[in-house]
Amino acid sequence: MKLYSDEELAELLDQPIFHMISDVADHLDVECYVVGGYVRDIFLERPSDDIDVVVVGSGIAVAEELKRRLGRKAHLSVFRNFGTAQVKVASSQRTGQAGPLEVEFVGARRESYSHDSRKPIVEDGTLEDDQNRRDFTINAMAICLNHDRFGELVDPFNGLADLEDGIIATPLEPGVTFSDDPLRMLRCIRFATQLNFQIEDVTFEALQRMADRIKIISAERVGVEMNKIMMARHPSIGFEYLQRSGLLQILLPELSALDIVEKKNGRAHKNNFYHTLEVLENVVKNDAPLYLRWAALLHDIGKTKTKRWDPAIGWTFHNHNYLGAKMVPAIFRRLALPLDAKMKYVQKLVDMHMRPIVIADEEVTDSAVRRLLNDAGEDIDDLMTLCEADITSKNEVRKKMFLENFRMVREKLTDLKEKDYVRLLQPVIDGNEIMEMFHLSPCREVGILKQTLKDAVLDNRVPNEREPLMKLLMEKAQEMGLS
């Protein structure tokens, strides 16, 4: 973070786009301020291509005049029902910016809310009114764009001090802020996660108190914020805040339920919630994409329902991977996440995440690795990344043994992939030929015959060639009474 004087801020805003807005503001005799994330990111020294401008007057009028001056190189969108307008500038020639730029204009306003809706009642207001309605102090700072005050920082809630101290706090009483717009509770946690800030105590207490209000927010908006938390550098910060606040119990009760340690006869299982956060952080170290992170977050959600006590061996979670995979679609629907190949990918990784561990815990055989590659297909590398991340044992000897065996599994996988085994492992005799040969329609018998051939190829008991496979097929068909 870096602090700037008003004169230095004026130099940072010494760009054609801001001078154009300044000229328009003075021409229309209105006050204009750049606000919100753009101002915050100036002090955080982060790039930002989205500019929010508050106009004490008509934001639409300023946007229309700016578009007229920019000409064809800009695109204007007006949203009269909301009193806002957006100017998109695709070229840097008129703005001095390095790439595409979006400037959103809104008239200064005051807002009030009913208890069961996050749609505000809006009235015209002053800059102070507009700053009052902002979600957090670090987003409530404004910089004047009018010529006579160009670069002047307006910071009534000490947002700059909170930014310097790494604090998330609200301009108004936080209970009012969160009740008015409960989505701000997720945004609060998201900013704390992205910026690695602390949530101020009074603000967090209000968040805990108001958590139930999140239920009036649409699934789509919740899902967007959850994905932003997930893509942070350290998403575990956000999920720990979600758990402590009570929001996780509402949004992802399957994950929240893992936050328990049960002990019996002196034997305790680990806290699978914090284990999950550790696994998530481990995949993030490998720059994991969004849905691999979701797979890491959900990989153990089946453990709560599969937990059993065995006097001989202690706590068990048999088939938690299988049950967890079945739980994924309901979670994706609840959070309005895509129910397409992305969801199936997460299901697949959750279901298969124990497979490499089982292989690594035993002798690493060619047959087991061939089966793993065949079943995982193109997702094998992500599966291995997840499984390696899942090794969080504090027993360094055991951890070293698993990781060494995983290295051997990866070597064998590399050899198989180089030989194009994904293609070679598919038997040369397919289901259509089997149905034609034995005059069958699609049925259980066809599946058994196909699986017989596939198992033989995967186990390397017969070469993937027509003559030996045909011999095996006829033997199996005769055993089943089909020939």
What are these regions (language model features)?
Residues 1-483:
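Catalytic cores of the polymerase beta-like nucleotidyltransferase superfamily
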